[in-house]
């Protein structure tokens, strides 16, 4: 069969395998490529290259494949620490996840931790693959494991009763030892992923937002703010808000320029200069955002999930405690904040991931799932994500 060229006509979805070490995440990834992509063997996926995201080195393997309905980019990480870092930094975005649980072992500590992380970082949907079912002869035992997985998902506010759970064996699929537990299960799994994991809204369809990187004044024209449009579309003549650091102000975009050409609009992905009416050069600064009125609010207090770099990763050499005051780098600027650790957490060691409360000294345009770096004097010591806003 001739290799078809990559068509951009199908919706694109980013997913990943999560779950406990040795439960079969990488074997499952290989098995999916066998039936839906260009086959990648276990060792090709397992030898994941290192990447850097927000100053943190992470090993992730990327494969792609497609079903009749969608094109998928799939990430698989070799080690548990890579999952933690990947999910917190958003190095590889996940619109949904396949949770792999060994039927022979049931849910294990990392199963729980990955579900919790998925909740904290806002992974929208999870589908479960109950792997190694060829090692379990007892149907009642399988039902017990399934029940345990559903209870665990519900505990972390996923709809445990509705989530599709597919029983199979990645190894059987790779070795063709059982069609039912192998190929059929993999095809059932991808049907479930197709139907249960929602297609993400494209950035261009979301409300307009552009982080401000720079401000210029052009004599006779007014003030220009530049940056890369993160999402949505801005049209000349539209009203926008400037949010963060200072009190929110409204203004009108009177011009949009890209590569020195005047445009009638800027859209997600474009690096633009926006000419804004009635705003002085000193009224607007890097670190604020330009956005659709009412779409984003400034906040100072939030709950976050963060990963703290190890000494070897260039992070701190010592632990920190409640009242730690680093800088939080949101989008384009650093803001000092005070950390409050949860009850029962005495201190945080380099290499830990932790839930914490943060109070910033000035408000920043913020919403759930916004990512940030934790820095000390310009050096990255951690990465985090806003899990919920307090005020």
From Swiss-Prot:
<dbReference type="InterPro" id="IPR031157">
    <property type="entry name" value="G_TR_CS"/>
</dbReference>
<keyword id="KW-0251">Elongation factor</keyword>
<feature type="domain" description="tr-type G">
    <location>
        <begin position="10"/>
        <end position="201"/>
    </location>
</feature>
<keyword id="KW-0963">Cytoplasm</keyword>
<keyword id="KW-0547">Nucleotide-binding</keyword>
<feature type="region of interest" description="G5">
    <location>
        <begin position="169"/>
        <end position="171"/>
    </location>
</feature>
<keyword id="KW-0378">Hydrolase</keyword>
<feature type="region of interest" description="G3">
    <location>
        <begin position="76"/>
        <end position="79"/>
    </location>
</feature>
<feature type="binding site">
    <location>
        <begin position="131"/>
        <end position="134"/>
    </location>
    <ligand>
        <name>GTP</name>
    </ligand>
</feature>
<dbReference type="InterPro" id="IPR004161">
    <property type="entry name" value="EFTu-like_2"/>
</dbReference>
<feature type="region of interest" description="G4">
    <location>
        <begin position="131"/>
        <end position="134"/>
    </location>
</feature>
<dbReference type="GO" id="GO:0003746">
    <property type="term" value="F:translation elongation factor activity"/>
</dbReference>
<dbReference type="InterPro" id="IPR041709">
    <property type="entry name" value="EF-Tu_GTP-bd"/>
</dbReference>
<dbReference type="InterPro" id="IPR050055">
    <property type="entry name" value="EF-Tu_GTPase"/>
</dbReference>
<comment type="similarity">
    <text>Belongs to the TRAFAC class translation factor GTPase superfamily. Classic translation factor GTPase family. EF-Tu/EF-1A subfamily.</text>
</comment>
<feature type="region of interest" description="G1">
    <location>
        <begin position="19"/>
        <end position="26"/>
    </location>
</feature>
<dbReference type="InterPro" id="IPR027417">
    <property type="entry name" value="P-loop_NTPase"/>
</dbReference>
<dbReference type="GO" id="GO:0005525">
    <property type="term" value="F:GTP binding"/>
</dbReference>
<feature type="binding site">
    <location>
        <begin position="19"/>
        <end position="26"/>
    </location>
    <ligand>
        <name>GTP</name>
    </ligand>
</feature>
<keyword id="KW-0460">Magnesium</keyword>
<keyword id="KW-0479">Metal-binding</keyword>
<dbReference type="Pfam" id="PF00009">
    <property type="entry name" value="GTP_EFTU"/>
</dbReference>
<dbReference type="InterPro" id="IPR009000">
    <property type="entry name" value="Transl_B-barrel_sf"/>
</dbReference>
<protein>
    <recommendedName>
        <fullName>Elongation factor Tu</fullName>
        <ecNumber>3.6.5.3</ecNumber>
    </recommendedName>
</protein>
<keyword id="KW-0342">GTP-binding</keyword>
<dbReference type="InterPro" id="IPR009001">
    <property type="entry name" value="Transl_elong_EF1A/Init_IF2_C"/>
</dbReference>
<dbReference type="Pfam" id="PF03144">
    <property type="entry name" value="GTP_EFTU_D2"/>
</dbReference>
<feature type="binding site">
    <location>
        <begin position="76"/>
        <end position="80"/>
    </location>
    <ligand>
        <name>GTP</name>
    </ligand>
</feature>
<keyword id="KW-0648">Protein biosynthesis</keyword>
<dbReference type="GO" id="GO:0003924">
    <property type="term" value="F:GTPase activity"/>
</dbReference>
<dbReference type="GO" id="GO:0097216">
    <property type="term" value="F:guanosine tetraphosphate binding"/>
</dbReference>
<dbReference type="Pfam" id="PF03143">
    <property type="entry name" value="GTP_EFTU_D3"/>
</dbReference>
<dbReference type="InterPro" id="IPR000795">
    <property type="entry name" value="T_Tr_GTP-bd_dom"/>
</dbReference>
<dbReference type="InterPro" id="IPR004541">
    <property type="entry name" value="Transl_elong_EFTu/EF1A_bac/org"/>
</dbReference>
<dbReference type="InterPro" id="IPR033720">
    <property type="entry name" value="EFTU_2"/>
</dbReference>
<feature type="region of interest" description="G2">
    <location>
        <begin position="55"/>
        <end position="59"/>
    </location>
</feature>
<feature type="binding site">
    <location>
        <position position="26"/>
    </location>
    <ligand>
        <name>Mg(2+)</name>
    </ligand>
</feature>
<dbReference type="GO" id="GO:0005829">
    <property type="term" value="C:cytosol"/>
</dbReference>
<comment type="subunit">
    <text>Monomer.</text>
</comment>
<dbReference type="InterPro" id="IPR004160">
    <property type="entry name" value="Transl_elong_EFTu/EF1A_C"/>
</dbReference>
<comment type="function">
    <text>GTP hydrolase that promotes the GTP-dependent binding of aminoacyl-tRNA to the A-site of ribosomes during protein biosynthesis.</text>
</comment>
<dbReference type="InterPro" id="IPR005225">
    <property type="entry name" value="Small_GTP-bd"/>
</dbReference>
């Amino acid at each position: 069969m001739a290799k078809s060229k990559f068509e951009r006509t199908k919706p694109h979805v980013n997913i990943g395998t999560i779950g406990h070490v040795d439960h079969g995440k990488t074997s499952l990834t290989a098995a999916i490529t066998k039936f839906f992509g260009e086959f990648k063997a276990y060792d090709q996926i397992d030898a994941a290259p290192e990447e850097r995201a927000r100053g943190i080195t992470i090993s992730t393997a990327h494969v792609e494949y497609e079903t009749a309905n969608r094109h998928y980019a799939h990430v698989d990480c070799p080690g548990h620490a890579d999952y933690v870092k990947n999910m917190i930094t958003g190095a590889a975005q996940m619109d949904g996840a396949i949770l792999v649980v060994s039927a022979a072992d049931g849910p294990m500590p990392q199963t729980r931790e990955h579900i919790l992380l998925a909740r904290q970082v806002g992974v929208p949907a999870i589908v479960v693959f109950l792997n190694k079912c060829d090692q379990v002869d007892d149907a009642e035992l399988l039902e017990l494991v399934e029940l345990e997985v559903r209870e665990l998902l519900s505990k972390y506010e996923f709809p445990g009763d509705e989530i599709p759970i597919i029983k199979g064996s990645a190894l059987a699929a790779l070795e063709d030892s059982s069609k039912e537990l192998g190929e059929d299960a993999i095809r059932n799994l991808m049907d479930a992923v197709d139907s249960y994991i929602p297609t993400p809204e494209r950035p261009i369809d979301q409300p307009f937002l552009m982080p401000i990187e720079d401000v210029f004044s052009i004599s006779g024209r007014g003030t220009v703010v530049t940056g890369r449009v993160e999402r949505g579309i801005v049209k000349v003549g539209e009203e926008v808000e400037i949010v963060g650091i200072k009190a929110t102000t409204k203004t009108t975009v009177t011009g949009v320029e890209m590569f020195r050409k005047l445009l009638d609009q800027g859209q997600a992905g474009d690096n633009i200069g926006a000419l804004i009416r009635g705003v002085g050069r000193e009224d607007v600064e890097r670190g604020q955002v330009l956005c659709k009125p009412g779409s984003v609010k400034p906040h100072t207090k939030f709950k976050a999930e963060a990963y703290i770099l190890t000494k070897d990763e260039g992070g701190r050499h010592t632990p920190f405690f409640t009242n730690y005051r680093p800088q939080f780098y949101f989008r384009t600027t650093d803001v000092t904040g005070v950390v409050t650790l949860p009850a029962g957490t005495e201190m945080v060691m380099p290499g830990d991931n932790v839930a914490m409360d943060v109070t910033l000294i000035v408000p920043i345009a913020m919403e759930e799932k916004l990512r940030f770096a934790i820095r000390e004097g310009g050096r990255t010591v951690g990465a985090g994500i806003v899990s919920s806003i307090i005020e």
